[in-house]
C-alpha cells in the first residue's frame, strides 16, 4: 500500500481531473478537503468517473461554500476506485478553491 495526497487549485469553471487510478491498482479515496479561498460564496461539484461502467456519479453537486469556508470528509468510510477511475471537480466561474484528496493505492490483488 502506498499513501498519496494530491492537491490542486483548479481553474474556475473548468472540468479538472484531480486523480486517475493507475493501471494495475485500485485506490481507496479516504480524505477530501475543500476550501473556498475567494471573497464570495461559490459552489463546487465533485465527481467520481467509473471507467468500467463509463459513468459519472456526483459526490457533491454544486455545493455552496461561503468565503473562506472549508469542508472536510474523512473517517471510517471510503470510496474504492479501480483502474482508470477518476476523481474530478468543477468550480463555479470566478471562484477560487483549493482541493486536497488522499488515496491509498494498492496492487490489484486485494488483501
In which residue ranges do the predicted regions lie?
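Solvent-exposed, conformationally flexible loop/turn segments
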Residues: 11-16, 65-71
Amino acid at each position: 500500500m502506498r499513501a498519496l495526497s494530491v492537491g490542486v487549485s483548479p481553474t474556475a469553471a473548468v472540468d479538472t481531473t484531480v486523480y486517475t487510478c493507475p493501471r494495475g491498482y485500485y485506490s481507496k479515496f479516504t480524505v477530501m478537503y475543500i476550501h473556498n479561498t475567494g471573497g464570495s460564496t461559490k459552489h463546487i461539484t465533485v465527481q467520481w468517473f467509473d471507467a468500467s461502467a463509463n459513468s459519472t456519479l456526483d459526490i457533491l453537486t454544486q455545493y455552496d461554500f461561503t468565503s473562506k469556508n472549508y469542508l472536510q470528509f474523512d473517517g471510517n468510510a471510503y470510496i474504492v476506485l479501480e483502474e482508470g477511475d477518476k476523481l474530478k471537480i468543477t468550480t463555479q466561474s470566478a471562484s477560487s478553491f483549493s482541493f486536497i484528496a488522499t488515496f491509498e493505492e494498492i496492487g490489484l490483488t486485494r488483501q
